[in-house]
Amino acid sequence: MKNISLLGYSDKLSARPGETVSFKISSTLKKKFTASLKRSISADPNPKGVGIIEEDASKYFKTTSYPSREQDFNPGSYAISKKPIKISIKKNFTLSVIIFPTISSSKDQSIIAVNNFEIYINSKGLSTIRVDKKSISIKEPLELRSWYKIKVKISINGNVSISQKILKYKDKKEITNKGKLIMNKDASGKVSLAAIISKGVASNYFNGKIESPQITVDNKIIGDWDLSSNTSSTVVDSIVGPTLILKNFPTRAVTGSKWDSSEMNWQHKPKHYAAIHFHEDDIYDFEWDTDFKLKVPKNTPSGIYTMKIKCDEHEDSMPFFVAPTINKLKAK
C-alpha cells in the first residue's frame, strides 16, 4: 500500500437483480472518496480505437461519498496447523523436511517452525536451525532449484545436529554441523510451513517447494503430512498430527523430489507430485472490511458495469457483470 493511494475490489464478479455486491476500499487519503456507478460500453483505452465509453448508471446506485481509511494486506503463501501439536520431550526431538529453494533473499526464509524452534534459510543461503535467538547453520550454501533433505535432531541435554543432503547427486555425502542449543521440554504449539507466525501475522516467507515435513519426539512420529493428498483443496490432511490449513493459495500438485518425468499427470502418480510451491507474493483474499454495498435493482439491464471510486486525482474502477434474472423471458 505504499504507492497506491486509492484501491478497491468487489466480493464477486457477477450478480443478478436482487443480489448484493460488496465493495472493499483502502484509501490513504484524508478526504472522503466518491463512489459512482457506470455502465461500460467500451473499455478500449487505445486512442486509435473506439475509446472508453461509459453510461451514467446513477439511477441504480446513487453517487455517494464515504470516509477514507487504509486497510492493510499481507501477501505470501504458507501453511499453519489447525490446532497446536503437543510436543513433550524426554530424550530427543527430530524434524525432517525436503525442500526445493527457488529464490535467494536478503531476508530469512522460514521452512518449518513450531514454538520457539525454526528451520530456515538465512540471508547467506545457509540452512539454519534456530531455538529462541540462538542458531546453528550448515557451512555450505544451498543450491537453488535443487532438492535437499534437511534433518535436525536435538537432545534434551542441548546437543544439536543439522544435516542437509542434495538429492540429485547420489554419491554426494550428507553435510552436517553440530552445536549446543537448549530447547524447552514442552515445545507444543502450532506448526507453520513457509513462514513464521508472530501474533497472528506471517513473515519471512519461503520461496520454493516443500515436501514430506515430519516431526518425531523420542523416536515416535507425532507429525507427518503427505502434501500430495487432497490437492484440490486448501486443507492438507495429516497422516499423524493436526490438519494443515493453506493460506493465500500456494500451488499444489507440483513436481516433487521423486518426479522422474515418467508421468505428466499428477493424478496417475501423486507421489511424484507430492510438493507444494510457496511464494512470498501469493495472494488470495485481502480480507478487507466492506465499505459499501450495491443491491442490484430488479430493473437493472444486464451488462458490464464499473463501480468507480475517486478522490482528487486518484481513482480506481471495479468491474462486474449484471446477469439476467433467472427464468425470465428474454428477447428473441
Where are these regions (language model features)?
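Low-complexity, Pro/Ser/Thr- and charge-rich linker/hinge segments at domain boundaries
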Residues: 1, 7, 186-189, 223, ...
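Extended acidic/polar, glycine-enriched regions
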Residues: 33, 284-329
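Extracytoplasmic low-complexity segments
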Residues: 34-35, 40-73, 177-187, 203, ...
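Extracellular glycan-recognition modules
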Residues: 76-130, 217-222
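Short hydrophobic/aromatic patches on beta-strands that form ligand-binding or substrate-lining surfaces
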Residues: 93-105, 150-152, 193, 210-215, ...
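Short tryptophan-centered beta-strand motifs in secreted/extracellular beta-sheet-rich domains
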Residues: 95-97, 145-164
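Flexible glycan-contacting loops in extracellular carbohydrate-active proteins
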Residues: 124-128, 171-210
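Short, aromatic/His-centered strand-loop micro-motif at the edge of beta-sheets
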Residues: 129-149
